Amino acid sequence: MTTTLLLGIAILCSASVVPDSDMPLKNSPTEPLGYIDTLSIQESIVRSNFSSDAGSPLRLKTLDKETLSFRGASRTYPELLNGIPSLYATSESGSYGDAKLNIRGFGQSNIAVTLNGIPISGLVSGNMYWNNWMGLADATYAIQVQKGVGSSFLTDGSVGGTINIVTEVPDEKFEAEAGIYGSFYGTVKAFLKIGSGNLPKGWSVNLMASYVGGDGYVDATKVNSFAYMLNVCKTLGTDHKLIFTALGSPEQHEQRGTRLSWEEVQKYGLRYNRNWGLRDGQAFNLNLNNYFKPYFTLQHIWRGERFSMKNSVYVTVGNGGGRWSENKSTPILYRSKDGLIDWDGVIATNRETEDGQALSILSDYMAGHTYFGAISSMEYRLDGGWTIGAGIHYQYYSTWENEKISDLLGGEWWYEDYEHTSLAGLASRNPVKTVGDYIRTDNGKVTNHGTAYLSAGWRSEKVTVNFGASVFGASTRRWDKYNYYGGDVWSPLAGGVGGSIKAGALYKIGRGHSLYVNGGWYSRLPYSNVWFASGNNEISRDVKNEMNAMGEAGWRWVWNSGALELTGYASLWKDKSLMSNAYKVENSLDVKYMVTGLDAFHCGVEFEIRQRIADWIRLSAFASVGNWKWMNDVSATIYDHYSGNALGDINVYCAGLPVGDAPQTQIGADLDIDIPAGFGLNLNWRFNNRMYADFDPVTRTNPDDRTPSYRFPSYHLLGAQLSWTRRKSHPEDVGCRIFLGGNNLLDSVYIERGKDGASHNLESFRGYWGFGRNFSFGLCLSF
């Protein structure tokens, strides 16, 4: 009843209101679904546009540079997108840089991410590690969120949607920008951007550098990150352009890696982090992450009167890891009276062992990859409103990971129990290890992935139709020097073929009204961590392509001072595969099992409305209501890793359980007021409800337990930002913007993320609570 009332209030309050600058109102041409020219680089460097918000058969939302700057202080990159219906982004654990994103109830592995038209989601699990892209917010020109199928045929992960990111390149004139953002709890960001404008012989250069440092909101979560971006553009004649981009963000940040109980939050507060303590009088965090992922692209864009082509090559080499711990029995449990790790107690215990063997140690868990690829896409405009397109994409992805002892914590040596941790057994290896020695893991994967597509589109004054199909194939091999020491370290080849079909149509009724419909079908290959889910070179049994069928229909109404959009969607996700945690089988060691054939159904309604009430006031509101559930119970067979013999069957009972990890009801509103003398005020309100704790379906093995995972209490968030802006009226002027913002002004206590417990209630739940009331500030100068 409360949700229905709030939804009604949101719609009524905004019934006479609608869009602002981040919802373009002009009916610009729409690119065909197959053509992935998502760049809109200052309209002159690259004529490759985002899909038009007003003329596309997709549910879109575009955030421009000014909007992103307005939201950017002390937030992770995905959090810039909050306020879009059915999208939920948080900092995950509260650590700076760690973030998590859901769209329409689907997690990151079902959300495609492209950067300047190039897919950047990982091929191992489909996830995005946003801390590897910390500086991206300062280099972004615009972001477009495409719900559902998306416009790209070069990514096969767009089930929830696609995030298209476009970085800045030089404009025609010289420009420079510098600024400093910060939070009152200690995080500070400084940045500098310089654009050369047009230089002789068709050259232009853009440079960005930024730094983030200081304390996070959560205790002992310092951050130290530098970011850079270089763009060099060369115009060749009237139709050709070359764009070279280099960007990266070497970073180090402390983390909160352990979820909290409600009892701990009540006792120690929202900032509590149980992963640190004092060591030699200094704060010392058990979890410290560092990573550097330099990224390079070279793009050639040829745009003629009828024929257009875009060619891209890219390469990135990632390297980094994090502080880890290994223990002989239980994790580090020594606690001081204030709930922190008692490092002195841990060290004393290691020193008291008779033979000097360490019971607990620290290690560096390292991971890296080499990732390169090439894309070629083309489009030809025919007579009669027809357009045809085609493209190919090749990706090579090689990963590695290992673990190295970094600190014996007062001990003299560590015993590596090869007999129980390695499939090869001892294999003549020395089990006595010390600082600098490798333990526990030394493996990686090599994946080759290729995609090809064909598309077509037809457009008249009132009708737009787009359709196309793609085929993709991949092969993966895994190597493991730890489990197969002294033998063949390579696995057999795993892989397969998949495909997709997409189509969309829009009809302009007249007077700003239009109706649209789109749909798609995917047969998506398993990610490499599904093929090799058991931690060794054995290929997972009975794994099939995931099938995704989705569709949406909507009504869009655009008028001079506003816009309204209403969309209904449905997505069927079939044959999901999940690997269980360790499971005890009678007369056998703990084993894992692969659950296949899980199905889920996501459907819902989204509403958004915006209105410029007067020249000085704008009001917008949105609402989304979803119904996301697991559909079926499934069975799994447990196999012995050594013999391959079946050990037994196990059943998983998920039918009818709500999907967790994102709110199924969202309502929000924004009020923007222009005050005389350059001042501006933004007020924003968000309401989240019907959010269930995340859970692993494979843990639901009790046929009598059909209780949904823990349902979080609903909550309201109120924010505000006061700004003063002095715009440039002449090229010689200096523009200035100063702002002061506040988040969670009501100081609401709410849960952002977490895992369900055995009792499916607050007592057994473990998770992360949101930030309390906090404030941010910023100063930005433009030249």
Q: Residues of each region from the PLM?
A:
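Short acidic/polar hinge/loop motifs at secondary-structure boundaries
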Residues: 100, 119-147, 166-168, 271
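Conserved C-terminal beta-signal and adjacent last beta-strands/turns
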Residues: 247-249, 506, 517, 549-551, ...
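Surface-exposed extracellular loop regions of Gram-negative outer-membrane beta-barrel proteins
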Residues: 258, 475-482, 493, 506-552, ...
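Gram-negative outer-membrane beta-barrel transporters
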Residues: 459-462, 568-572, 593-697, 780
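Extracytoplasmic beta-strand/coil segments of soluble accessory domains associated
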Residues: 57, 78-119, 135, 141
